[in-house]
Amino acid sequence: MTTTTLGTAIFLIFAGMAHANEIRVLSTQATEEAYRELVPQFEKASGHKVTTVFTGTLDANKRLAAGETYDLLIMSAPSIDEHIKDGKVVPGSRVDLARSGIGVGVKAGAPKPDIGTTDALKKTLLAAKSIGYSTGPSGVYMVGLFQRMGIADEIRHKLKQTPTGVFVGSIIASGEAEIGFQQVSELSHFAGVDYVGALPADIRQFTTFSSGIIAGAKTADAAKALVKFITAPAAAAAFKKRGMEPG
């Protein structure tokens, strides 16, 4: 953010906010890198303290079901909508932050397979010794894609699903998975992984990640200010650097 733009954003977002608060956030890992870049700027500008738990979709749902208390939730848009329906997120509070496609990675130094077309990807999957995928939205999509490709039965014994909260990049880097799939934002800069690219255009899928105010939030106004800060035009570069499209 430029000094001028940041100064304007601070004035518009924090004008009239007299007290600093602690904002408790439960967040998906897909937006983590961009979020970590932006939050310290927000804390410095606002005086608020942000405490964040980053985890996978399944674990986030378990935490909410167990009654853990937060002020702001960041998950996929469909998950936010579900939590609005079940009363855990305030209706009308959903704000879309950014969207991410699904990327492909292999262990650093390994030959990069051909994923340029759907047919090439299919051949690569059939030839791979092991295939990593997640429990999150990207994993759900990939399981459906394997079925639509007609290869689900042939590759089932090679599939390696990471536990919730564990990056697919970790099992690629360790060699447990020869090839792996996860959100571009989670995979493209993972240590020990060479990023191959996104899925072919005709089967490309995007997931929108959104925020929502938790019902009964103690610091709802401060949480809303955080959302305004990380969705301001000047914050877009932080998401773009991680392969995400803001908004």
Stretch-by-stretch model annotation:
Residues 1-5, 25:
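Low-complexity intrinsically disordered segments
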Residues 4-15:
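Bacterial N-terminal signal peptides
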Residues 19-58, 62-66, 74-87, 91, ...:
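Exported/periplasmic ABC-transporter solute-binding proteins
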Residues 70:
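Dinucleotide-binding Rossmann-like beta1-alpha1 core, especially the glycine-rich loop
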